[in-house]
């Protein structure tokens, strides 16, 4: 099973748990001492603020400056770490564009950024393996191609994720099916 990371990563807890999962059965001995210590720290980390404020910035820096050390440990799992870290960086940008409010503002810059990120991430993943079958579950805002009612309010996201995938400029070459937020492509 390949974990396809099209959506942005909006939870530090989820990112920490995912990193621990990726490191679960890895052999750290091939990496240099600094990388080993970082990965052991992540693996044993119990405090969210330590992960967020210390270990995660080190991991991002390591990915940017010496990714080969991480690849020695992760091997084929490296792509999943890359996607998760990209998703986290996209979440930080989205939060900044949304003025750090908890809910995305419909019609705002953050909503448009998130739709762009979803589309670009899936496009990148699809280019890596265009013959695969993809399945995903997305919120109504990402998949409704017409107005929809939520909490008594009518919402509409211009150029939403699924509208782009179904449009004439789409990178997809198969059948796209959307039923109540479930997206499949064959």
Regions found by a protein language model. Name each.
Residues 1-186:
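Compositional signal for N-terminal targeting/processing segments
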């Amino acid at each position: 099973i390949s974990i396809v990371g099209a959506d942005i990563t909006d939870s530090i807890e989820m990112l920490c748990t995912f990193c621990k999962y990726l490191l679960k059965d890895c052999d750290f001995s091939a990496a240099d001492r600094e990388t080993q210590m970082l990965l052991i720290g992540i693996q044993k980390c119990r405090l969210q603020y330590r992960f967020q404020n210390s270990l995660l910035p080190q991991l991002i820096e390591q990915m940017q400056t010496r990714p080969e050390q991480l690849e020695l440990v992760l091997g084929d799992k490296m792509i999943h770490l890359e996607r998760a870290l990209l998703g986290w960086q996209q979440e930080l940008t989205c939060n900044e564009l949304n003025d750090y409010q908890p809910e995305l503002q419909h019609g705002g810059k953050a909503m448009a950024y998130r739709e762009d990120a979803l589309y670009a991430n899936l496009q990148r993943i699809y280019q890596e393996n265009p013959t695969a079958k993809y399945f995903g579950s997305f919120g109504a805002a990402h998949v409704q191609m017409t107005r929809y009612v939520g909490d008594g309010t009518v919402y509409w996201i211009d150029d939403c994720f699924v509208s782009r995938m179904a449009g004439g400029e789409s990178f997809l070459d198969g059948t796209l099916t959307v039923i109540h937020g479930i997206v499949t492509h064959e």
